[in-house]
């Protein structure tokens, strides 16, 4: 078994992660005759409920601020023991004055789930919190509320990167967060494969995540750490945008070198195809769109047939850790479309007669950058994942040939490419927007092609960050941040030296 532990840091991260977990729950089958391609033990843990019944809950830690959990309780129906209506006053014989905060009323969607009724149609108006469309029970240890700050507070906003960094330091000093929160989940794993983090990177959660990843790297050594770093894509006032930009720069400078995979995600993306209808002001809708690409791109990590996803990301030398997230929604009739190939029993880079052996530059959705000029960029490494359609009949090379092909690509300065195909289509659940996609199957599913791409576009983004940091950041921090961003940028630049360059030397 190769388990993956997940950490969810903050409101925007929890919106995206809730869609992710709802999708994982939808893959469960309840009949021995039904087989699934998904190994549920990767993300779910068995346990015992309060009444002695068996449970199956996510391997995750959900961090958020006070007031951000909505109607979600730490102790749910699986783990809640019945208590006496009047427990008595014990040794105290004086008057009691009990003050309780007004509880948040569960959404109609949650009420219907609890009663076993058909779920009502959700809308941007009816979703107030990420818990309003959550379909799972979590273990009580998974729910971690940080009471030092309150959601959307005007008095103490959780916005500055240093605030998150300081909060983690204070909590870790008092409680040892890894020992208190993460270790119980880690000790349950037979063979921990990776740690996956959902976090926003342009506010205080970026600082919190940076300190957390630093501790994870100390504790878990060479284990893979995958970070989904959410950045606000909506327009804001200039001074707020500068603050966001500096928070993003600090996050990518501190977190990406410690990560195996760092994916900046624009929420929402700048450009949308005509086939997608999106309420850009709704976090529920924008995170649902992101989940189609993010969940598809990582689907190989959950297959029963083990895939060495980490090697695919590493490319030839493992120097590129910042990847772009891109996707394309494909029509049901795939007869005239490009198709990546992956035999469920044999994984590898390969060439074929069609376009499936070539890297893709054009996608309908680009979740990482708002620069439309992608044609001139150099691609170092790309992992493509296609789902929901039958691949063209192609014969992959043997494993013996794959290493040679990879070396040939490297020495010829060609992009490293890995393609996966999974016949499981992306399901449109009742917890997601119903009419977001105009192209979909009759059975409420869609075909998706997603990609994780390491390219020279990252160098352009980092260079812009350096310029802003040089103007805005204080003197004490400026040199370290600008130089650090410059060192990361060098890995994503393409520098060609001719023979005359050497002759001049």
UniProtKB/Swiss-Prot annotation:
One of its GO terms (biological process) is mitochondrion organization. InterPro entries: DML1/Misato (IPR049942), DML1/Misato_tubulin (IPR029209), Misato_II_tubulin-like (IPR019605), Tubulin/FtsZ_GTPase_sf (IPR036525). Its main location: mitochondrion. Keywords: Mitochondrion. Gene3D superfamilies: Tubulin/FtsZ, GTPase domain. It is found in: Mitochondrion. Belongs to the misato family. PANTHER family: MITOCHONDRIAL DISTRIBUTION REGULATOR MISATO (PTHR13391), PROTEIN MISATO HOMOLOG 1 (PTHR13391:SF0). This is Protein dml1. It comes from Neosartorya fischeri (strain ATCC 1020 / DSM 3700 / CBS 544.65 / FGSC A1164 / JCM 1740 / NRRL 181 / WB 181) (Aspergillus fischerianus).
